[in-house]
A protein has these predicted regions:
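Sec/Tat signal peptide C-region and signal peptidase I cleavage site
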Residues: 18-22
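Bacterial N-terminal signal peptides
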Residues: 6-17
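Short coil/linker segments at helix-helix boundaries
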Residues: 23-163, 168-204
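N-terminal secretory signal peptides that target proteins for export/translocation
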Residues: 1-4
Length: 204
């Protein structure tokens, strides 16, 4: 991933100061950066899939969801695209608001579809199950509990695939989302910043 184009210094500042601004309705313009996210999908949809992941990183949620859905339409066997849809529908993890009830319903439908399709690789299945932890028992769990479950799932994902920089970056983002105002040590923010700083040194 070209992290510089994803404004990593800005993400670090956001982690230390406040929630990022999500682009819910706008269309992306300018460079989104590059993503390397290997999949078992048809090679013809790989560029669009990686562009959708770039949109997810850049908080371009409406355009990203549309692109993930187009990928799934063009390759109905691309189960990992359902992970992208469910991830987009969680909304901005740094804002603390989480998915809407309608978004959660749509996300669960996407997750169920991904499970039905069956990802061709264990890594892709693990990504789908990681995002699924956030939506489990959605109606009966508070947002903070969902955020903690999500962070733990992505931490496990990053540990299981130590060469997967995407897993590390998503864990850093979701871990930052667990920071509370009561914790004046800012442990979650600092841990996430450390992960992202390592990635920035790797991809200056």
């Amino acid at each position: 991933m070209n992290l510089q184009l994803f404004h990593l210094p800005l993400l670090l500042a956001l982690a230390l100061s406040g929630p990022a601004q999500a682009h819910e309705t706008d269309s992306p313009s300018g460079p989104l950066g590059t993503v390397s996210f290997p999949t078992s999908c048809d090679p013809k949809v790989q560029p669009a899939f990686e562009r959708a992941v770039a949109m997810l990183h850049s908080f371009w949620y409406s355009a990203g969801e549309k692109t993930f859905r187009e990928v799934l339409k063009d390759d109905p066997g691309c189960a990992i695209a359902t992970w992208g849809i469910a991830s987009i529908l969680m909304s901005n993890p740094l804002a603390g608001q989480g998915a809407s009830a309608k978004g959660a319903e749509q996300a669960q439908a996407a997750i169920d579809e991904g499970r039905r399709i069956g990802a061709k690789s264990e890594r892709e299945r693990d990504y789908i199950e990681a995002v699924a932890t956030y939506y489990k028992d959605f109606a009966t769990r508070p947002e903070k509990d969902r955020q903690v479950s999500r962070a733990k799932a992505y931490e496990a994902l990053a540990q299981r695939y130590p060469a997967d920089d995407e897993a590390k970056i998503f864990f850093a983002l979701y871990n930052a989302g667990t920071q509370t105002q009561a914790d004046q040590s800012y442990a979650a923010y600092l841990k996430s910043a450390g992960i992202l700083e390592t990635q920035f040194r790797k991809y200056p």
